Amino acid sequence: MDEIIEWLLRLIDFDTTSEGPDAERCVRYIARILAERGVLVHAYTTEGALRRGHHLLAEVPGERAETVLLHAHLDTADRGGEQDWLFPAGRASRRRGCVCGRGALDCKGPLAVWMKLLSDAAEGKPRPYTLKLLVTDLEEQGGAEGLGALLAAHPELLSDVKLVIGEGGGFPFPFREDMYYTFQTGEREPAADRPARTAADAADRDRILAMGVEKGYYSEDILAYAVRWDRLAGRRLDVRPLYEDMEDFFTAAPVSAVYADHGPAFASALREEIPNARLMPCVTPGTSDNRWFRNAGVPVVGFFPLDAANSLGGIHGSNEYISESSLRLAYRVISGALDRIT
């Protein structure tokens, strides 16, 4: 844990905002740390409208070329009005068991954990598969000039990749005696100029929910939970537009086997740390760099489990932080999942 926190503090101190000057220095820092631990590193650049993008691929060969790829972006949202921050936005600090500063949660905290997992792999016995880390830039600008351009120029980066683990999931919420953790299996991109729709009735909603199971985006037990939630929520708010969005997504979405193929490894590792934890496979709104992998036909999950007390309010806002307990939990769970993936 000491290394993860040390690295994260240093990563936050690099100004990698949209027009920040430190992306290249940040990549060099990551490369040096990993190379010192025996990890193979390769640097790449792409051209962006605001600045050049800087990217890094790190690799620990395994017994097979088949690859699990960890992904994080090094660029951060801009800091906004620093008068709204309770601590320095652009300088890392530790307060009350938390690491604070822009990028702590999105996405330098996960990056520091991924660096530790690569270091562990380089110093331990070979895994059955190759483990790689891809650090990308310009995600906050939409990714087209970052990961999108990088993969267009270097499609070989995805050769032999059987799974990508990225951001967009791992957010906890309680339900009865269990703690559910979101497990991103897809993303619903914003639609421009949507045509008017006839609101879905109850029978339509059941059919639309079933589409998600049939295509593999979530499971039967999650479907049962959603139906119960719908019956309760429907008494207080109009949930019909939600189902219209879901129908749009599932009609066009490809069949996904990512939850069936890889969910059990993550669920088992999570329950080892939190016995009452369960995965909640979900399709999230918005767009992250995960979509570039999905568009290339590569399975990807969004999952970085956080401590239940860790607020998400600082993402793209003020007072961004990540708790040290979240860093510890994510490290243990993802390490355990990697041990279970064969």
Question: Where are the regions that the model predicts?
Answer:
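Acidic/His- and Gly-rich active-site-bordering loop/insert found
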Residues: 1-102, 121-129
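Hydrophobic/aromatic beta-strand patches that form the interior of the parallel beta-sheet core
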Residues: 12, 42, 68-70, 134, ...
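Metal-dependent amide/peptide-bond hydrolase catalytic core
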Residues: 16, 169-179, 183-335, 339-342
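Solvent-exposed loop/turn segments at secondary-structure junctions
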Residues: 19, 64, 74-77, 139-141, ...
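Active-site nucleophile and cofactor-binding loops and adjacent substrate-binding regions
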Residues: 46-48, 103-107, 283-286
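Glycine-rich phosphate-binding loop signature in dinucleotide/nucleotide-binding domains
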Residues: 63, 156-163, 273, 296
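Short, conserved micro-motifs enriched in small and acidic residues
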Residues: 97-111, 140, 321-328
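Acidic/histidine-rich catalytic neighborhood of metal-dependent amide-processing enzymes
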Residues: 105-186
